[in-house]
Amino acid sequence: MDKNIKILIVDDFSTMRRIIKNLLRDLGYNNTYEADDGATALPMLEAGDFKFVVTDWNMPIMQGIDLLRAIRKSSKLKSIPVLM
C-alpha cells in the first residue's frame, strides 16, 4: 500500500484520534486528516481524495454506522475501505 495515501480518522475523542494518528505515523503513513464526527467527515470525504477511513462507531451528530452508510451510498465514495 502506498504510504502517501490520504487517510481520514473520525472520532469524537481527540485523544483517540491522536493515538490512531501516531500508530499510523509509526507505520509510515503521514498523510492523515481528522474529523470529530460523521457530519464533519462526510464533506471532507466528498471534497478530498481519501483512500482509507478509520472511524469510531459511537459519535454525536452522525454515528460511524451512518457515516458508513452514506459512504456506501455515494458513487464517488463507495469503494473507500472503512475500518470501524
Question: Where do the model's predicted regions map?
Answer:
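A short, hydrophobic beta-strand element within the central beta-sheet of small alpha/beta folds
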Residues: 69, 79-84
